[in-house]
C-alpha cells in the first residue's frame, strides 16, 4: 500500500488435497519445481522477454532539462545531477546489452539458469535508481501525493512509481536472497 495500491497477496490452502494425476514433479520435491518457476519469473522480471515492448517513459535527460535547465555551456546546469544521469545511463546501456545477449542465448536453446538472479537484482536496482533520480531531479514537484492543485498528473504518477518500485527488490525473491543465490550458484562460494 506504500504507493496507494495493493498488488501483493498471500494465499493459504488449509486441508488441501491434490489428486495424484495433478502432481507436478516428484513427491516432496516441490521446492525444485518452485525454484525453476521463480527462475522463469525472474527472467521476465528483468525484462528478458519483451524488453522492447515497454514504454520507458520520459528520459532522465529530458526531465532534467525541463526541471533544472541548461547552463550557459549548453550542459545541464547541475554538475552532480548531470554526473548521476550519465552514470545511470551508462549502467542501463550495459545492462541492456547483456540482457540482449542473454535473450539471444535463450533463443538459441540455452536455459538462463541462476544468472536470472543477477538480472532480477540489478534490474530492480536500476529501476529504483531511475525513479529516485526522476523524483529528485524534479525537486519538491517530484514528491506529490494527492494534491492535484499543486502537482500535475505526471508528477503524481512518478511519485507513485518511485514508491511502488521499493517493492521491486522484494517480489520474485528479495535482493538479499538473490545475492545468496549468486554467491552459491554463480560464483560457487561455500555456504
Go through the PLM ranges and name each one.
Residues 42, 68, 103-106, 110, ...:
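Short amphipathic alpha-helical interaction patches enriched in hydrophobic/aromatic residues
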Residues 73-79, 108-110, 189:
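Secondary-structure transition/capping motifs at alpha-helix termini
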Residues 80-88, 113-122, 159:
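Alpha-helical scaffold segments that form or flank carboxylate-/histidine-based iron centers
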Residues 93-150:
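C-terminal helix-coil-helix/basic helical segment that borders enzyme active sites and/or dimer interfaces
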Residues 28-50, 138-191:
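Glycine-rich phosphate/cofactor-binding loops in nucleotide/flavin-utilizing enzymes
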Residues 1-96, 168, 184:
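Glycine-rich beta->alpha junctions and the first turn(s) of the following alpha-helix
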Residues 37, 60-67, 101, 105, ...:
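Generic, well-ordered alpha-helical scaffold segments in large soluble proteins
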Residues 1-4, 135, 160:
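A general structural signal for short secondary-structure junctions and capping/turn motifs
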